Amino acid sequence: MPLLDSFKVDHTKMNAPAVRIAKTMRTPKGDNITVFDLRFCIPNKEILSPKGIHTLEHLFAGFMRDHLNGDSIEIIDISPMGCRTGFYMSLIGTPNEQEVSEAWLASMQDVLGVQDQASIPELNIYQCGSYTEHSLEDAHEIAKNVIARGIGVNKNEDLSLDNSLLK
């Protein structure tokens, strides 16, 4: 089984909240695709609650599109990490970390503006596979934490995992 790029970085050196360009690629038609690691929590020290990350998934995807999509950028997908320390965002285009950071902060402000559970998009039995597993309160706490701490940048060259540690 090939070793995925996300496991070639040293998680003990990651800062959070922080943006990292996890991968870039070019399609055969010439489109640039960028995958971002949006790290909300310090790996192995902090974790997002299951209900909080789920609610954030419903809110964050739309808010990030509102703030980042444009003529040269289109978000393909934003998905929570299985380790519950952040999200991966795949998009067409090549925004820099600062642009992504600004959109992320604005999105966290938008999350705080959601006043009740009924305002969470797609929160129903038909559009959500676990529609009872949500917490707007937890999502608000996550957003407040990101805003209070600010968003940094994790660079791949600073996180390169020594080959002796690869398994």
Swiss-Prot record:
GO terms for biological process: quorum sensing. SUPFAM superfamilies: LuxS/MPP-like metallohydrolase (SSF63411). Binds 1 Fe cation per subunit. It catalyses: S-(5-deoxy-D-ribos-5-yl)-L-homocysteine = (S)-4,5-dihydroxypentane-2,3-dione + L-homocysteine. Keywords: Autoinducer synthesis, Iron, Lyase, Metal-binding, Quorum sensing. Pfam families: LuxS (PF02664). Homodimer. Involved in the synthesis of autoinducer 2 (AI-2) which is secreted by bacteria and is used to communicate both the cell density and the metabolic potential of the environment. The regulation of gene expression in response to changes in cell density is called quorum sensing. Catalyzes the transformation of S-ribosylhomocysteine (RHC) to homocysteine (HC) and 4,5-dihydroxy-2,3-pentadione (DPD). This is S-ribosylhomocysteine lyase. It comes from Haemophilus influenzae (strain PittEE). The lineage of its organism: Bacteria, Pseudomonadati, Pseudomonadota, Gammaproteobacteria, Pasteurellales.
